[in-house]
């Protein structure tokens, strides 16, 4: 481990995680459900750590907790969908945000794309992606994905998350 990395690790030990999480909550984000196809069953996870990475090629990234119950399935998938939720889809977000909730949901309206990724209906936008790679940093795994198809709806309002609350 180099000196800079060791220095950063010592600094982070001094930062209270509760307050650090509170500080990060001051950044308003959109809300997504990342979904994969596992033997023709819908598996999803609510994620607000979604970001554009590159326009050329079209790349995006998101991260999941290393201890997430379906992390192995996400690491092993080839294709996935990033569903950007609209303001009226708060219950979908809550369903997939639960830590110990069942992963297979039958009450979510969706269809499978040409690459068999689950696309949640009536979203603000949907991105169909091919997973390029993933890497572990801290307590999360960062997924880098190439966008291969997308849809969007200009007539919907976004679901936002700020200060640990939906807005």
Regions found by a protein language model. Give the residues of each.
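Basic, polyanion-binding surface patches
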Residues: 5-167
